[in-house]
């Protein structure tokens, strides 16, 4: 948690003033019992109403000034805590956006979401409470003990005994509950994961009638979380009665010994009442300190989790200072004995892949499920770094390109058609921020999306809901293809991005791409043989290895894997067409 305190930079003044005003409030609070003692010993004893009213006015003033100090302290602590969480959340968001797919796969989306929301909130609460209580509570305890000694040294010893005993009880309860709270946080992560998976896969869950099974899984984890929280709650519930019992014994001691000293004239009745008030103040301060410890413990646990994210360094480094020669026209892509293994996997996803895609060629990639097709094309824009070998674009290793230049060269259409909340125009401009109307319309036309966009009353200004939920699967895919085309990239990668299109639309799309993207090197990943049949070169993958390279005709003669795929999907006449 200490390492996160750097995010309080810029709020040094608030971080100083918040505890200062809390200590001022505590000072006024410590004076109040003495005023009460004077009212009893002088005003009431002498039946001096003027004196009583005078002291009451002083009490009111002390209360008002204390309240003002408290409100000012609350303002400064809240401002500092909110500034802290805002800076931390921004840094986390920026840091996560720099992580490669490897780190994102390792950390997991649900965990990252929990950390940037719940854990940041826990850290914010911890900072807020520390600024308000970390000096105030000890100040009250020490101040009350000192005040008790100024009234009577022997009764002050009762305070010296009671405070450590209450502190030990609080420490014991906190030491027991803190690990339980940490365990509860892990269950909360699991709940977040299940909830997210169920929400994202809601259609699949309902399609297979798995609602009861999903509910059962969620209920089990939720019940475990509840049990842990209840267990922590039961132990924490001992805090108030245990400390109250100790305090009551201390008060009994004060009253018993105080009454004896009152009877002999050493103490006054007002002073005994003041001592009881100081004991109550100590108890309240220690309980507040216990709550602070709980909040700080949760904040520290969250701090560890947040530091885990911040300490995760991106495995891909951006050669931001490199200056590469811009090549006009389509790009040449070369794979030189490329192998790749996912983090944590024992088996390579790709093994010894070598091929050359000449400028302007269309490369089809086909193979069985899980054979490494998507992995291969993800290496071109450098979403992952190769384990061995080289990926070369226009004579330069992809590692030598600045990310901005490399991503500008490559237009990526991912397997999952992801659209963002906003208008269709907004989504198109992801491909090119200053795209003109003509460029957008051309991209939509090639992607076979102009028809349905024009049919919308608002056209390009039609609102797209989060994830494109208000569009069909085929419409989403066509818009993501158009988005990639708007930027007029040198390399276009379509990763099984036409799977939701009917055969006629798919054929029209392939024809448009072939005719109107002469200046691009195109990679088409597909499960459909018809989608890659006309490609200049076809790569056939089998269990991460290159089973064949060539044209459709060449592979039908030389590659058994490709022949089996084609014959399983097409008739003999369609194969030879």
Model-derived segments and spans:
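Hydrophobic alpha-helical transmembrane bundles that constitute the permease/transmembrane domains
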Residues: 19, 23-31, 64-71, 123-126, ...
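Helix-loop-helix
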Residues: 47-51, 147-161, 170, 231-305, ...
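Short intracellular "coupling" helices and adjacent cytoplasmic loop segments at the cytosolic face
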Residues: 46-47, 82, 90-114, 118-120, ...
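Membrane-integrated ABC transporters
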Residues: 1-29, 36, 44-58, 65, ...
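Transmembrane helices of ABC transporter permease
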Residues: 10, 14-27, 62, 129-184, ...
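ABC-type nucleotide-binding domain
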Residues: 326-577
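An intracellular "coupling" helix at the cytosolic face of ABC transporter transmembrane type-1 domains
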Residues: 10-13, 98-102, 118-127, 131, ...
């Amino acid at each position: 948690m200490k390492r996160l305190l750097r995010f309080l930079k810029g709020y040094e003044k608030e971080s100083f003033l918040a505890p200062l005003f809390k200590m001022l409030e505590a000072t006024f609070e410590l004076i109040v019992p003495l005023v009460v003692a004077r009212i009893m010993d002088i005003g009431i004893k002498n039946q001096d109403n003027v004196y009583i009213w005078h002291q009451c006015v002083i009490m009111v003033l002390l209360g008002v000034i204390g309240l003002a100090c408290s409100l000012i302290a609350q303002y400064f602590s809240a401002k500092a805590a909110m500034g802290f969480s805002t800076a931390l959340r921004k840094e986390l968001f920026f840091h996560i956006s720099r992580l490669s797919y490897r780190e994102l796969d390792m950390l997991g989306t649900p965990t990252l979401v929990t950390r940037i929301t719940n854990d940041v909130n826990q850290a914010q609460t911890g900072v807020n409470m520390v600024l308000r209580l970390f000096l105030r509570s000890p100040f009250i305890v020490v101040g009350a003990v000192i005040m008790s000694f100024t009234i009577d040294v022997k009764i002050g010893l009762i305070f010296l005994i009671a405070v450590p005993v209450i502190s030990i009880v609080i420490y014991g309860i906190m030491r027991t509950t803190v690990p339980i709270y940490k365990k509860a946080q892990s269950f909360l992560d699991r709940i977040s994961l299940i909830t997210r998976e169920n929400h994202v896969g809601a259609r699949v869950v309902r399609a297979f009638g798995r609602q009861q099974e999903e509910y059962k899984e969620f209920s089990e984890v939720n019940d475990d979380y509840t049990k842990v929280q209840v267990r922590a709650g039961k132990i924490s519930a001992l805090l108030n009665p245990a400390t109250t019992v100790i305090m009551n014994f201390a008060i009994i001691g004060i009253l018993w010994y105080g009454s004896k000293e009152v009877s002999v004239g050493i103490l006054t009745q007002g002073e005994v009442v003041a001592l009881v008030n100081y004991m109550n103040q100590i108890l309240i301060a220690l309980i507040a300190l216990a709550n602070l410890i709980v909040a700080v413990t949760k904040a520290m646990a969250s701090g560890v989790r947040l530091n885990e994210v911040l300490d995760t360094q991106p495995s891909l480094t951006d050669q931001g200072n490199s200056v590469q020669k811009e090549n006009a026209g389509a790009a040449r892509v070369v794979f030189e004995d490329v192998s790749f293994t996912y983090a944590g996997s024992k088996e390579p996803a790709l093994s010894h892949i070598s091929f050359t895609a000449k400028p302007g060629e269309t490369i089809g990639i086909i193979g069985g499920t899980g054979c490494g097709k998507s992995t291969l094309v993800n290496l071109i824009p450098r979403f992952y770094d190769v384990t061995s070998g080289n990926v070369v674009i226009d004579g330069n290793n992809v590692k030598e390109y600045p990310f901005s230049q490399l991503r500008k060269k490559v237009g990526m259409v991912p397997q999952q058609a992801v659209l963002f909340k906003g208008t269709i125009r907004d989504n198109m401009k992801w491909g090119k921020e200053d795209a003109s109307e003509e460029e957008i319309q051309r991209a939509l036309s090639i992607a076979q999306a102009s028809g349905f966009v024009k049919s919308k009353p608002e056209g390009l200004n039609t609102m797209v809901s989060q994830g494109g939920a208000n569009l069909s699967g085929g419409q989403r895919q066509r818009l993501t293809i158009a988005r990639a085309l708007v930027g007029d990239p040198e390399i276009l990668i379509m990763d099984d991005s036409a799977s939701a299109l009917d055969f006629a639309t798919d054929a029209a799309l392939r024809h448009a791409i072939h005719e109107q993207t002469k200046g691009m090197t195109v990679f088409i990943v597909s499960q459909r043989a018809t989608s890659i049949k006309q490609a200049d070169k076809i790569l056939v993958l089998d269990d991460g290895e290159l089973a064949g390279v060539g044209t459709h005709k060449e592979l039908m003669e030389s590659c058994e894997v490709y022949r089996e795929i084609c014959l399983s999907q097409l008739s003999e006449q369609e194969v030879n067409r």
